[in-house]
Amino acid sequence: MTGSSGHLGEALVRVLSAEGDDVVGLDLLSSARLGVTGSIVDRALVRRSVAGVDAVIHTATLHKPHVITHDRAAFVATNVSGTLNLLEAAADAGVGAFVFVSTTSTFGRALTPPADAPAAWITEDVPPVPKNIYGATKTAAEDLCELVHRDRQLPCVILRTSRFFPETDDRDDMRAGFDDLNLKVNELLYRRVDLDDVVSACRLAVARAGALGFGRYIVSATTPFAPDHLVALRGEAPSVVRRLFPEYEQIFALRGWKMLASIDRVYVNARARHDLGWRPRYDFAHALDCLRAGQDPRSPLALGIGAKGYHAEPTGVYTPGSTSSG
């Protein structure tokens, strides 16, 4: 388990360990759970860590928030070279499943159509259009996964996860315009997934990798939208949501919440549900049920992991002390 001290890594370690799996964590932080302290850029360390394991779940990465603190070479070293080190070590060790946790940020500029265009319907077939070094290096790492699978027959599943971080939004206008939990519940309609559902997708990917050989999947909460909603979503998102969930306005009003005026993209998880048998639980409908009952819509696992931030030193909204979990 690379990145075993991160949001997803720690969640996976907790769940897998509780179920009796023997988990070896690899993380830069000395507090890494159950594991080895070090970098995936260290090829010899990676090979020692992978020896004897049945599966690799690769969550370690430089994220989008690191763009402001790390240069492009650092992104290439960690996200590309580090991933290649893991892939080659896993292939040499005869590992039975390699799960690469990627990101919907690989789609890049394809996610933001022109203002007068319908919302983008994002499936795995949409070609990536690089927007920043984070997305570019994650796309390159995905290509390496496919290459090593084809050359070495390493069973490899790529999970392009949407937002699951608990930190506040990085856009000033969003933080100023929305309560944090309000925004995250809205995002379940089209671009967010709960941490618990990401964990279940990873577990299924490990179990299905051998049969699949190779696969690339979007991991996001199941959207209620359909292609015929895309035009209206750009300028009349509240009316679309109202037709699908007539009760949402009253539930939101009790909290002083509001819906986004415009939605620019919709992530489609149909392939993951079909191929992996994935059944995400935490969608917008579930959130409304929780809010109606006076309960938190986030999973106990997500609440238990909490906010970690992305930097050891203060770095704006990405610093643990400056964030809010809602």
Question: Where are these predicted regions, by residue range?
Answer:
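Alpha-helical substrate-binding/gating segment
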Residues: 167-183, 188-218, 222-224
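Conserved Rossmann-fold NAD(P)-dependent oxidoreductase catalytic core, especially the SDR/UDP-sugar
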Residues: 84-131
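Catalytic helix-loop patch of NAD(P)-dependent Rossmann-fold dehydrogenases
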Residues: 77, 112-156, 184
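Mid/C-terminal beta-alpha module of Rossmann-like enzyme folds, strongest
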Residues: 200-260, 269, 274-275, 302, ...
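NAD(P)H-binding glycine-rich loop region in Rossmannoid oxidoreductase-like domains
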Residues: 32, 38-78
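N-terminal Rossmann NAD(P)H-binding glycine-rich loop of SDR-like oxidoreductase domains
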Residues: 1-19
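Glycine-rich NAD(P)-binding loop of the Rossmann-fold in SDR/ketoreductase-type enzymes
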Residues: 41, 55, 74-82, 128, ...
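Flexible, glycine-rich beta-alpha linker
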Residues: 107-108, 133, 151-175
